[in-house]
């Protein structure tokens, strides 16, 4: 059964805390660098706006999918495992989503996944935040 949705202390709190640190960004800078250098397996966090929602990927583990636009204009696919974490209900274009996950390079802009807890405890836990709720 997916993990319980947690109430975030404030919407996008972790992203806001990261952005408040000297030299930190909303995650767009690190993702842009990983894309330019074609790096994968990069732990990232920040926030972006939903550019487009996509049908769920139902092959293998089920994933809620959407395209997110970052503050620098780059778009990335978010693939959120809904077998391990709750789906974000009523997600719409223009919504702000905070994230912590792993970036994987592809020529279309990349993918952010591992936006959930790791039941085996071998990988950094990730999450998504939407309207004050954390999904992990």
Stretch-by-stretch model annotation:
Residues 1-136:
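OB-fold and OB-like single-stranded nucleic-acid-recognition modules
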